[in-house]
Swiss-Prot record:
Source organism of the structure: Histophilus somni (strain 2336)
Source domain of life: Bacteria
PANTHER family in the record: 23S RRNA METHYLTRANSFERASE, RADICAL SAM CORE DOMAIN-CONTAINING PROTEIN
Function: Specifically methylates position 2 of adenine 2503 in 23S rRNA and position 2 of adenine 37 in tRNAs. m2A2503 modification seems to play a crucial role in the proofreading step occurring at the peptidyl transferase center and thus would serve to optimize ribosomal fidelity.
Protein name per its UniProtKB record: Dual-specificity RNA methyltransferase RlmN
Further comment found in the protein's record: Reaction proceeds by a ping-pong mechanism involving intermediate methylation of a conserved cysteine residue.
Name of the gene encoding the protein in the UniProt record: rlmN
Keywords: 4Fe-4S, Cytoplasm, Disulfide bond, Iron, Iron-sulfur, Metal-binding, Methyltransferase, rRNA processing, S-adenosyl-L-methionine, Transferase, tRNA processing
CDD domains: Radical_SAM
Domain Radical SAM core as annotated: residue spans: 98-337
C-alpha cells in the first residue's frame, strides 16, 4: 500500500492546508482541484501551470488515484453499469443518460448493513465504508469514460444521486466531503439541487446533515405503516415513520436545495405494499410533509421473495395518491437487462461478519449514535 496521500481524499479546503504544510501558497490547491476534476487529469507532469519543482515534489508525497473499472456492462437503453475495484472488492456505479440530463448513481459503502428485504445489495452483507476518494473517484472515473472533460458548457454528468450500494448516512464522514467536491466550482460545480442523498432513515445523522451540507434529499420509505416497514426496512424498528418524517421536516425547514419538497421513494411490491388501503395510509403519513412521490417498479434478483406489482395495481395506487393532490411519478426502469436497475446492485462484497452479528453491531452503533 502506498504511503503517499491520495489527493482525491481531500476537499479543496483540506488541500489548501496540505499545500501550506508543504510551504506552498494555498492557491495551488485551487489549480490542482481544477486539473483533477475539471480536466480529469491524474498526471502531475501534465499540469502545466504548476512549476516543475513543485510537480516533482508532489510526485514524492502525493498521488491522484480513483477506483479502476473491473467490469463494464452496457444496456440496450443506453444505461452503463461499472463494477469498480475498491481494494480487493467491487462496488457498482450506474450511468443513466437521458435527453436532458445524465445521472450517475454512486455507491457509498461496500455492501450494506440495513438488510432491506427487497434490495439485492442488502443480501450481500456489509464490509466497510468507502473513502472519499472511492466515492468521488466513481464520478471522476465515469466522467473520464463518458468524456467531454474541460469542454465549455458540456457536462458528462449533470446529476449525482447517492443511491448506489450502501446507506450514505452511515458513512457521513466520507460522503459529505465527497459531495462538497461535487458542489465545488473548482471541481464539478454541480448545483446542490443536482446532488441527491437517499437515505432509509438514520434519523440522528439526518438531523446533523443540515449542519454540514445542503443537498437534495430522498427518503426510501417503501411502506405506509410501521408494522410493514419494520419487516421490509428493518431500521424502522429503531427510527419509526413518525420520527423519520419529523426529521425530514426539520431538514426541509433549513434546506434551500429541495425547493421545500422532499422526494419519497416507494418500491412497488405485488400484494405487499401496493394496495389501495396502502395508498390511503401513505397519504395520511405524508399529509404534513411537502413532497413528490416516486413509485419504483420492483426489480427482481435471485431468490427474492417478491414479485413486481402489476401495471393495474401501480396505476390504481398512483391515481389514489393523486386524488389527494400529491405529485406522483412512476420511475422508468433503466438498465434492468444488466442488473443495473434500482435495488439490483450487488458488487463483490466480502461480508466481514455473519448477518446476525452485523445486525447486532449495527443496532449498538445506532443506539449510541455512533454513526460516522
Amino acid at each position: 500500500m502506498s504511503d503517499k496521500i491520495n489527493l482525491m481524499n481531500l476537499t479543496r479546503q483540506q488541500m489548501r492546508a496540505f499545500f501550506q504544510e508543504l510551504g506552498e501558497k494555498p492557491f495551488r490547491a485551487d489549480q490542482l482541484v481544477k486539473w483533477i476534476y475539471h480536466f480529469g487529469e491524474d498526471n502531475f507532469d501534465h499540469m502545466t501551470n504548476i512549476n516543475k519543482k513543485l510537480r516533482e515534489k508532489l510526485k514524492t508525497v502525493a498521488e491522484i488515484k480513483a477506483p479502476e473499472i473491473a467490469v463494464e456492462q452496457r444496456s440496450a437503453d443506453g444505461t452503463i453499469k461499472w463494477a469498480m475495484q475498491v481494494g480487493d472488492q467491487q462496488v457498482e456505479t450506474v450511468y443513466i443518460p437521458e435527453t436532458d440530463r445524465a445521472t450517475l448513481c454512486v455507491s457509498s459503502q461496500v455492501g450494506c448493513a440495513l438488510a432491506c428485504t427487497f434490495c439485492s445489495t442488502a443480501q450481500q452483507g456489509f464490509n466497510r465504508n468507502l473513502t472519499v476518494s472511492e466515492i468521488i473517484g466513481q464520478v471522476w472515473r465515469a466522467s473520464k469514460i463518458i468524456g467531454n472533460f474541460g469542454v465549455t458548457g458540456v457536462r458528462p454528468i449533470t446529476n449525482v444521486v447517492m443511491m448506489g450500494m450502501g446507506e450514505p448516512l452511515l458513512n457521513v464522514a466520507n460522503v459529505v466531503p465527497a459531495m462538497e467536491i461535487m458542489l465545488d466550482d473548482f471541481a464539478y460545480g454541480l448545483s446542490k439541487r443536482r446532488v441527491t442523498l437517499s437515505t432509509s432513515g438514520v434519523v440522528p445523522a439526518l438531523d446533523k446533515l443540515s449542519e454540514m451540507i445542503d443537498v437534495a434529499l430522498a427518503i426510501s420509505l417503501h411502506a405506509p405503516n410501521d408494522e410493514l416497514r419494520n419487516e421490509i426496512v428493518p431500521i424502522n424498528k429503531k427510527y419509526n415513520i413518525k420520527m423519520l418524517m419529523e426529521s425530514v421536516n426539520r431538514y426541509l425547514n433549513v434546506s434551500n436545495a429541495n425547493h421545500g419538497k422532499v422526494t419519497i421513494e416507494y418500491v412497488m411490491l405485488d400484494h405487499i405494499n401496493d394496495g389501495t388501503e396502502h395508498a390511503h395510509q401513505l397519504a395520511e403519513v405524508l399529509k404534513n410533509t411537502p413532497c413528490k412521490i416516486n413509485l419504483i417498479p420492483w426489480n427482481p434478483f435471485p431468490d427474492a421473495p417478491y414479485a413486481k406489482s402489476s401495471n393495474t395495481r401501480i396505476d390504481r395506487f398512483q391515481k389514489t395518491l393523486m386524488e389527494y393532490g400529491f405529485t406522483v411519478i412512476l420511475r422508468k426502469t433503466r438498465g434492468d437487462d444488466i442488473d443495473a436497475a434500482c435495488g439490483q446492485l450487488a458488487g463483490d462484497v466480502i461480508d466481514r461478519t455473519k448477518r446476525t452479528a452485523q445486525k447486532k453491531r449495527f443496532g449498538k452503533e445506532i443506539g449510541t449514535h455512533q454513526i460516522y
